[in-house]
């Protein structure tokens, strides 16, 4: 086992003990965004156990327990990829393609940017609402004055209603205090509002 993995410290948050600080921070971010999730609620058998003529003991089954289940999304938190994990990930992909083709697998390396990028594009399915502003007048500027009070069920619906064109990117969390305020920047990415 990798020394880096051995040094991962469990952390408790909101009454649940998580296997790492990254997992706890991910749970905090999802909770702050109001995204319902299940933590380590499933176990998948990637390869059944078997007996081998080359060793006395039975070879144990190879299993995988996703860190988070969010609707049809499996979310894995990995700060560092070990060689063992890289092999296991390939088996996870194979299992999902053959057994659960509708399930989406994502891996995140942090509880902020890569997490939100992993969830990008699934808002309509998850049924969340967003607030969107028109394009700022000055390139790169963000103005809170133009945030609409109308809520939309998807980024695409909001863009159509406001006659916005361009590629919509994922939402950025305003703060970890339960607020949900989003705004479009000049590149049509959703930028963090500084309060």
Predicted regions and their residues:
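Acidic Ser/Thr/Pro-rich low-complexity disordered segments
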Residues: 138-146
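Short, basic interhelical loop/turn and adjoining N-cap
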Residues: 160-174
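Electrostatic, structured charged patches in enzyme active sites and in nucleic-acid/phosphate-binding
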Residues: 1-138, 150-157, 170, 183-195
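Active-site activation/catalytic loop segments of kinase-like enzymes and analogous catalytic loops
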Residues: 178
């Amino acid at each position: 086992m990798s020394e880096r993995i051995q040094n991962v410290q469990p952390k408790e948050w909101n009454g649940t003990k998580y296997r790492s600080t990254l997992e706890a921070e991910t749970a905090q971010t999802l909770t702050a965004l109001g995204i319902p999730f299940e933590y380590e609620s499933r176990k998948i058998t990637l390869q059944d156990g078997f007996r081998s003529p080359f060793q006395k003991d039975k070879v144990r089954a190879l299993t995988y327990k996703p860190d988070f289940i969010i609707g049809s999304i499996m979310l894995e938190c990995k700060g560092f990829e070990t060689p063992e994990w890289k092999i296991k990930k390939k088996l996870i992909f194979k299992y999902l393609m053959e057994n659960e083709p509708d399930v989406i697998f994502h891996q995140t390396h942090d509880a902020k940017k890569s997490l939100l990028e992993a969830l990008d594009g699934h808002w309509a399915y998850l049924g969340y609402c967003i607030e969107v502003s028109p394009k700022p007048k000055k390139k790169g500027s963000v103005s809170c004055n133009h945030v609409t009070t109308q809520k939309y069920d998807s980024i695409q619906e909001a863009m159509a209603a406001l006659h916005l064109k361009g590629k919509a990117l994922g939402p950025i969390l305003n703060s970890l205090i339960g607020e949900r305020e989003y705004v479009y920047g000049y590149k049509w990415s959703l930028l963090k509002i500084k309060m």
